[in-house]
Amino acid sequence: MNSVGRRNNRRRNGPRRARRVSAVRRMVVVQPNRAGPKRRARRRTRGGGANLISGPAGRTEVFVFSVNDLKANSSGTIKFGPDLSQCPALSGGILKSYHRYKITNVKVEFKSHASASTVGAMFIELDTSCSQSALGSYINSFTISKSATKTFTAQQIDGKEFRESTVNQFYMLYKANGSTSDTAGQFIITIRVANMTPK
């Protein structure tokens, strides 16, 4: 009789052990749900980074244009801004799409097409007041018979602050001192323009 009682005790204990095991299994099922909020948090982080990229400063673009058929006695004025007729992509394009802009860098390449016997120099001057009508300084120059490049920074062209897209930033005046109308060459000009506040 006592041995039968022991077997019955084992049977009663059996289901209790099974319930303990099943309880552990239910805890395991809950664990994958804990990773859910972490994945959502990572997605929010990526979204925040993308919002920081698109700000009110707009975009920066590089434009390249040329001034052709320069002669050994040529002179003229290039107006950098909405009156830059030599670069319609800027004056008639991007500046009509933004309220404010600034030119931060200018590279002026004089590409000579003159013969080795052509005498003279091509002088250029930057006018940030946009008021000069004639060359007043002969510091920056190119030899007509040789190709060369000059680069001007934002400080030299008044390009540190944004301005209205209806206002020119600076002029570049040029004048060759040759005595003939022989072919001199061309300017190839590269400018970097930052735009702000789309229209």
Swiss-Prot record:
The keyword NAD does not apply. The keyword Methyltransferase does not apply. Major capsid protein. InterPro entries: Luteo_coat (IPR001517). GO terms for molecular function: structural molecule activity. It is found in: Virion. This is Major capsid protein. Belongs to the luteoviruses capsid protein family. The N-terminal region like those of many plant virus capsid proteins is highly basic. It has been suggested that these regions may be involved in protein-RNA interaction. One of its GO terms (cellular component) is T=3 icosahedral viral capsid. Residues 1-21, 33-52 are annotated as: Disordered. Keywords: Capsid protein, T=3 icosahedral capsid protein, Virion. Residues 7-21, 36-46 have a biased composition (Basic residues). Pfam families: Luteo_coat. The lineage of its organism: Viruses, Riboviria, Orthornavirae, Kitrinoviricota, Tolucaviricetes. Changing residue 100 to L: In strain: Isolate MAV-PS1.
